[in-house]
């Protein structure tokens, strides 16, 4: 039950302004069926739970109306604390400072992020191959891939809503005609 989980996450913290969750957002391949996208998101979320020992909750979002039909994505929330027999316990590796991670012989936050991106690449590519697609996901940036494509600027929810209503938006999608 989601509400029980997130109430427990709030209750586990002593500070009222404590972080109770980390979000990982992943783009789901639009070439996959809804069932295949769900299986991929579920597998990745389970991998995060297994790796960090935390509770994981996720939601899949599909494109809205006449927007980019390829914008299938998942929002994955991880508790900041590990799941233990009595409830939520110590902070997970993802929440520790690099100084402490290094002292414990664990990957730094930068290395953890790279590993998550590699894990997503591996899982997404496996699911694409199983579905008969020869497309591949690459975890690297455009620059690291040697592409001279400028990354687009994320509009954000409020600017997107204004744009959909036909209002003037300073931060409009620059790649709309390249879709």
Regions found by a protein language model. Name each.
Residues 22, 54, 70-72:
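Envelope-exposed proteins and targeting segments
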Residues 25, 57, 75-77:
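Structured core elements
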Residues 11-39:
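Active-site acidic/histidine clusters and adjacent loop/turn architecture
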Residues 27, 31, 35, 76, ...:
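Short, charged/polar micro-motifs that form catalytic or ligand-binding hotspots
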Residues 1-3, 9-10, 60-72, 79-179:
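Single-stranded nucleic-acid nicking/binding segments centered on His-rich, glycine/basic loops
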Residues 16-17, 48-50, 64-68:
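A general structural signal for short secondary-structure junctions and capping/turn motifs
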Residues 30-60, 116-123:
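A short, contiguous, amphipathic alpha-helix enriched in charged residues
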């Amino acid at each position: 039950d989601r509400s029980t989980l997130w109430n427990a996450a709030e209750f586990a913290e002593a500070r009222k302004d404590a972080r109770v969750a980390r979000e990982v957002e992943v783009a789901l391949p639009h070439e996959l069926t809804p069932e295949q996208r769900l299986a991929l998101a579920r597998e990745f979320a389970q991998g995060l739970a297994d790796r960090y020992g935390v509770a994981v909750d996720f939601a899949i979002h599909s494109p809205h109306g006449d927007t980019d039909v390829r914008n299938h994505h998942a929002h994955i929330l991880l508790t900041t604390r590990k799941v233990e027999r009595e409830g939520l316990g110590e902070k997970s590796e993802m929440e520790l400072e690099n100084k402490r991670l290094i002292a414990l012989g664990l990957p730094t936050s930068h290395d953890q992020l790279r590993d998550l991106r590699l894990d997503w690449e591996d899982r997404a590519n496996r699911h694409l191959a199983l579905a008969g697609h020869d497309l591949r996901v690459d975890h690297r940036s455009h620059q690291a891939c040697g592409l001279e494509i400028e990354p687009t600027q994320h509009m954000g929810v409020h600017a997107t809503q204004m744009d959909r209503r036909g209002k003037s938006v300073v931060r409009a999608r620059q790649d709309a005609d390249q879709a």
